């Protein structure tokens, strides 16, 4: 009777994960015999059972943690404890440094804990801060990030790790390779959990919004990310309970508006209708951490998307009824005014109020420019279009000069202004300036420039392009407008 085949593969087959066929451990296996290789089993026997997470081999050298005892003296850890005591017993090991303390998150490897440890360190400037209005929002946003990691839902933890990885990979070259590996692994888990999520209670709604914003952030930092699809899916999930979101803490609505702006800006370019219409008076006297006091403009941007979609469907036929809809939108925009809270000037710094007022201005002017191009193709009736374009460009210049930073979430407005630019020198200058204006991520800069170059090439070729036909000549891949 032939003896049973050995269950232990030779070293060659083991390394290549090939099936090893041989009668016993001393014989040459079929693969090594065929390839005339030395067949041996010299490696040590592995211990039975699953390997502990702490024993996982890291592909890259782990940098020193940026944790500093100064955080204690500056009151960093206490700022979290005073506002949320639900997980107060967890703050001590967390603030002691995740990179060397696996007790809080035993399921994470050292690299993942290291990224979270860097991200939670509120003492140093964080990549989380770059898309906020200003410093008035930094502490609360950091608190929100930390709390999302400490909640029981594993989806939020996966999303937090994915975001931390790509944010640091985008900013620091020493993290680039590791961030890709860690970020994609955790993002895949988070997206799978987002698809499986059903909203049956308030906490499910919060989880969906935080997950959606986190995954949109991740997608904006990676090649072939799909921020539009993620925002669209999340908003479709949230739409049946939108009225519940309005009754919740305003900071929760900030997350929803982040998704709304991502989807709306893409819909404006592709002549599609967004998932949600945020009514002008849904958020009175509210300051959004991303959009400032410009949230109420999105009702009118939704209406522009709807008309643009109609024009594209009908082949650009501007009927009297459609023209009346466009004029109604224009009139609403002319009457629109900001509605900041009463303590607006006292509550925020001069730089922050400057940024917020400028955000509202450039987005409103961009809406007027789009309406103009619904009537007139690019390259015609340029006088009014160029006036709008210059107004937007000058506002960006003014804010860059006064504050040293760009306008968060307003890259789309700058794009509409740049569409009108002609002349090699002016276009070269616009591309160079986009490095300062579009600063959310390297991928967002690349996508911005690719879209702009495609548009200019189509204009130079003599194509008749209305706003509602932009998608026919632009790259159809999902873009990033932050």
Named regions from a protein language model:
Residues 216-314, 475-476, 482:
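Acidic/serine-rich, low-complexity amphipathic helices located in mid- to C-terminal regulatory regions
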Residues 1-140, 146-153, 458-481:
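Charge-rich, intrinsically disordered regulatory segments
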Residues 17, 411, 424-482:
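C-terminal region signature
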Residues 158, 206-209, 252-253, 257, ...:
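Start-of-helix signal in alpha-solenoid helical-repeat scaffolds, especially tetratricopeptide repeats
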Residues 136-152, 172-179, 272-439, 449-452:
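Cytosolic regulatory protein-protein interaction regions
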Residues 143-149, 161-176, 185-224, 234-241, ...:
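Hydrophobic/aromatic-rich effector regions of fungal transcription factors
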């Amino acid at each position: 009777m032939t003896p049973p085949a050995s269950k232990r593969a030779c070293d060659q087959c083991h390394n290549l994960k090939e099936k090893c066929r041989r009668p016993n451990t001393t014989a040459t296996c079929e693969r090594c015999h065929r390839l005339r290789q030395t067949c041996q089993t010299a490696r040590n026997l592995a211990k039975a059972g699953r390997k502990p997470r702490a024993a996982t081999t890291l592909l890259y050298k782990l940098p020193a943690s940026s944790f500093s005892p100064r955080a204690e003296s500056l009151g960093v850890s206490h700022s979290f404890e005073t506002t949320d005591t639900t997980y107060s017993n967890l703050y001590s090991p967390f603030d002691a440094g995740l990179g060397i303390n696996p007790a809080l998150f035993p399921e994470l490897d050292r690299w993942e804990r290291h990224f979270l440890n860097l991200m939670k360190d509120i003492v140093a400037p964080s990549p989380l801060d770059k898309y906020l209005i200003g410093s008035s929002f930094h502490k609360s946003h950091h608190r929100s990030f930390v709390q999302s990691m400490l909640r029981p839902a594993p989806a939020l933890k996966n999303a937090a790790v994915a975001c931390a990885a790509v944010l640091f990979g985008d900013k620091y070259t020493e993290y680039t390779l590791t961030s890709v590996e860690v970020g994609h692994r955790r993002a895949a888990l988070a997206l799978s959990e987002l698809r499986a999520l059903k909203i049956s209670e308030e906490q499910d709604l919060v989880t969906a919004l935080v997950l959606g914003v986190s995954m949109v952030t991740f997608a904006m930092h990676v090649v072939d990310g799909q921020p539009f699809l993620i925002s669209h899916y999340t908003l479709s999930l949230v739409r049946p309970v939108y009225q519940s979101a309005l009754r919740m803490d305003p900071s929760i609505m900030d997350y929803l508006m982040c998704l709304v702006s991502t989807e709306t800006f893409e819909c404006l370019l592709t002549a599609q209708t967004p998932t949600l219409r945020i009514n002008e008076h849904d958020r009175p006297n509210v300051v959004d951490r991303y959009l400032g006091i410009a949230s109420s403009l999105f009702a009118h941007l939704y209406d522009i998307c709807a008309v643009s979609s109609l024009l594209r469907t009908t082949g650009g036929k501007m009927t009297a009824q459609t023209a009346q809809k466009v004029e109604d939108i224009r009139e609403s925009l002319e009457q629109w005014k900001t509605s900041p809270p009463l303590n607006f000037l006292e509550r925020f710094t001069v730089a922050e109020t400057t940024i917020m007022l400028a955000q509202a201005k450039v987005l409103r002017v961009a809406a007027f420019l789009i309406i103009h191009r619904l009537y007139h193709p690019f390259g015609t009736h340029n006088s009014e279009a160029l006036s709008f374009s210059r107004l937007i460009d000058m506002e960006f210049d003014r804010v860059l000069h006064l504050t040293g930073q760009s306008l968060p979430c307003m890259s789309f407005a700058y794009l509409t202004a740049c569409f009108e630019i002609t002349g090699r020198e002016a276009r070269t200058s616009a591309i160079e300036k986009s490095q300062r204006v579009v600063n959310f991520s390297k991928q967002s800069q690349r996508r911005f420039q690719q879209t702009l170059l495609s548009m200019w090439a189509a204009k130079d070729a003599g194509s008749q392009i209305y706003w509602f036909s932009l998608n026919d000549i632009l790259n159809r891949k999902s873009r990033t407008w932050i």
